[in-house]
Amino acid sequence: MGDLPGLVRLSIALRIQPNDGPVFFKVDGQRFGQNRTIKLLTGSSYKVEVKIKPTTLQVENISIGGVLVPLELKGKEPDGERVVYTGIYDTEGVAPTKSGERQPIQITMPFTDIGTFETVWQVKFYNYHKRDHCQWGSPFSVIEYECKPNETRSLMWVNKESFL
C-alpha cells in the first residue's frame, strides 16, 4: 500500500449518447432532500467520464443507482494533471420518477488501496415521451469533488461538491 494522499480531486461528467449531448439539472430549493436535481432520460445511454488527481489512483468501476459501470482507463490528460476513465451508464429498464417526486441514487466508486468514494445524487428520470423536460434547467459539464481519504482506507470524506 502506498502513501495515503491528503486530498483526492475527482470529476464526473455525464453526456447523453449518441451525440455527446449535455445533461441538465434544476435548482429545487428546499422542497426535497437536496437543492439540485439531475435530469436523466430512461432508456438512454450516458457516457461517464471520471477524471482523478493524483494520477496514481486506480478505479475499475462506478456504481450509479445500483447499475455497475465498468470504467476503462483512457490515459492522462495532455497536461498530465489527471488520469481519465470512461464508461457507459445505461438507463434501460429504469422506471420514470413520478411527477412531483425525486429519487436519491447512490454513487459509489471503490479506489484501489485508499477506500471508496460515496455520494448521493438527487435525480429525476423522465420517460422518452417527456424528453423535452430533460432539457429544461441548467446544463452542466461536470460535477467536481474534493475528497479526503480516511486513515482506515475504507471511505473518502467529501469536502466539496461543485456543478460546473
Curated annotation (Swiss-Prot):
Subunit relationships: Interacts with the cannabinoid receptor CNR1 (via C-terminus). Does not interact with cannabinoid receptor CNR2.
GO cellular component, one term: glutamatergic synapse
Protein source organism: Mus musculus (Mouse)
GO terms under biological process: regulation of trans-synaptic signaling by endocannabinoid, modulating synaptic transmission
The protein's name in its UniProt record: CB1 cannabinoid receptor-interacting protein 1
GO MF annotations in UniProt: type 1 cannabinoid receptor binding
InterPro entries (alphabetical): CNRIP1
Tissue-specific expression: Highly expressed in brain. Also detected in heart, lung, intestine, kidney, testis, spleen, liver and muscle (at protein level).
Family membership noted in the UniProt record: Belongs to the CNRIP family.
Membrane-crossing residue ranges in chain numbering: none
Role noted for this protein: Suppresses cannabinoid receptor CNR1-mediated tonic inhibition of voltage-gated calcium channels.
